[in-house]
């Protein structure tokens, strides 16, 4: 999209295991002087309405607790059932709610890696009696083969100033979530990561918690 916004999320496919979210790469606009934004709109780009709303509300709430007003897109944007929002409508809402920055996150890709682990031989202890040896047949047996599947969900998050005419990219980051479990847990981890990084980049004030 030509026009700039801030933070989007897509439904995370769920797999078993413990989710871990890490920042893969980030860039900050060198011309950004650290001016504080007052009202930040959070937009999650997902076809799943519930996941999108959960993400927007969670991030907006955490931004607000940092002393900056966070506004969830789900609270001010009436989205069509299919297709993107009209850019003129977005501009009107941004002006109406006096928003000066937007956070947008989008799903980049989902990768699933399957690793095959062949059976591994191990040596049995030596038995010097018939009963100890009987049933082992050979002094070497094999552990069973098995497969391990790892899923990685990559999300891009951009922060834009929306001052006229079209705004400016302030910060962009790419995060990887490994073996995501429930969407709720992934959202919580992603939100925490985003806020922590925005504090580090002096886009948000540091937490007093």
Question: Where are these predicted regions, by residue range?
Answer:
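Residues that line or immediately flank small-molecule/substrate-binding pockets and catalytic motifs
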Residues: 8, 106-109, 177
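Sec-dependent N-terminal signal peptides
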Residues: 4-12
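N-terminal segment of the mature soluble domain
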Residues: 39-41, 45-114
């Amino acid at each position: 999209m030509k026009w700039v916004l801030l933070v989007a999320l897509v439904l995370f496919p769920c797999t078993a295991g413990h989710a871990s979210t890490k920042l893969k790469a980030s860039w900050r606009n060198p011309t950004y002087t650290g001016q504080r934004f007052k009202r930040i709109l959070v937009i999650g780009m997902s076809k799943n309405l519930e996941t999108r709303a959960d993400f927007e509300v969670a991030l907006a709430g955490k931004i607000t607790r940092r002393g900056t007003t966070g506004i969830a897109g789900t609270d001010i944007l009436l989205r069509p059932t299919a297709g993107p929002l009209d850019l003129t409508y977005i501009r009107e809402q941004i002006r109406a709610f006096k928003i000066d920055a937007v956070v947008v996150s989008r799903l980049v890709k989902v990768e699933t890696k399957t690793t095959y682990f062949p059976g591994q031989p191990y040596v049995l202890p030596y038995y010097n009696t018939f009963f100890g040896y009987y049933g082992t047949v050979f002094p070497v047996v094999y552990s069973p083969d098995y497969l391990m599947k790892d899923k990685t969900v990559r999300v891009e998050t951009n922060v834009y100033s929306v001052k006229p005419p079209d705004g400016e990219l302030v910060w962009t980051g790419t995060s990887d979530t490994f073996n995501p479990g429930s969407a709720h847990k992934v959202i919580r981890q992603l939100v925490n990561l985003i806020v922590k990084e925005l504090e580090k980049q002096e886009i948000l004030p540091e937490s007093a918690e």
